[in-house]
Amino acid sequence: MDKNLHQPLGGNEMPRFGGIATMMRLPHVQSPAELDALDAAFVGVPLDIGTSLRSGTRFGPREIRAESVMIRPYNMATGAAPFDSLNVADIGDVAINTFNLLEAVRIIEQEYDRILGHGILPLTLGGDHTITLPILRAIKKKHGKVGLVHVDAHADVNDHMFGEKIAHGTTFRRAVEEDLLDCDRVVQIGLRAQGYTAEDFNWSRKQGFRVVQAEECWHKSLEPLMAEVREKVGGGPVYLSFDIDGIDPAWAPGTGTPEIGGLTTIQAMEIIRGCQGLDLIGCDLVEVSPPYDTTGNTSLLGANLLYEMLCVLPGVVRR
């Protein structure tokens, strides 16, 4: 292990309930020189003015960090040792405009231009799903069009919401229109519930996306599916966007638009672990809404899924 790599603060150095609540109790880094030294970073985007039902995900980054205090460095299931090979830190939150959604989107894109300019691979704590659009805009400038693994209860391909083109339910329609995605390398997993028409998921299919509805995932391991996903999206840079409402509300009630019949926490880990070997260039975990998360379990799940994302990044060694 490189002694110069940042390490999470251990439970014997500071009690788990003490200290500053950064993600995994990692150092908080902001200076240009420190940013240049990072390989990956956790960054919060506390935006929820793009939501259509229950707000509150502006508090998601803070609570995910608070629930991350029990996460330890080594992944005992997969052998991943991310802190042995990558320099990782928490670089704080994007200072969004909470009164103007379009201005907030502009600010997010600008901030991710800066983050990517330091050579950092971003692991984003949302925030509602609107935030993925400006992140993808910034990523295209660096990596070109990307493949996408998108876990969600909803396709987020509405043309508009109340006449607005930018909202958490329009993100991937805009991403296609702006040529941000390599549409033949996109998979959406966990889509479910009711639609306005019988063809609501077909727009995605017509673009070349593979759509895996939640019912196709019931009562089974998703390891075989993820082998197919790797075949579909591999061969170039890939972004992973994980909406917590992809998980059944029995496990993740703290979200803005819950839908029954969703994925399990085990399936969520299978999906993320199944991304190992892909050329991941960024990840996000969105739509955790702490006001509806009375036990903290949704934030705890979000924190652990972000750790699992860290564990499958390119360059992570296994012990």
From Swiss-Prot:
Optimum pH is 9.5. Belongs to the arginase family. Agmatinase subfamily. It catalyses: 4-guanidinobutanoate + H2O = urea + 4-aminobutanoate. Its EC number is 3.5.3.7. It holds the Pfam family Arginase. Catalyzes specifically the hydrolysis of 4-guanidinobutanoate to 4-aminobutanoate and urea. Has no activity against arginine, agmatine, 3-guanidinopropionate and guanidinoacetate. Binds 2 manganese ions per subunit. The lineage of its organism: Bacteria, Pseudomonadati, Pseudomonadota, Gammaproteobacteria, Pseudomonadales. Mn(2+) 1 binds at H129, D152, D156. Mn(2+) 2 binds at D152, H154, D243, D245. One of its GO terms (biological process) is putrescine biosynthetic process from arginine, via agmatine. NCBIfam families: agmatinase. Gene3D superfamilies: Ureohydrolase domain. This is Guanidinobutyrase. One of its GO terms (molecular function) is agmatinase activity. CDD domains: Agmatinase_PAH. It comes from the Bacteria. InterPro entries: Agmatinase-rel, Ureohydrolase, Ureohydrolase_dom_sf, Ureohydrolase_Mn_BS. Homohexamer. Its cofactor is Mn(2+). Keywords: Hydrolase, Manganese, Metal-binding.
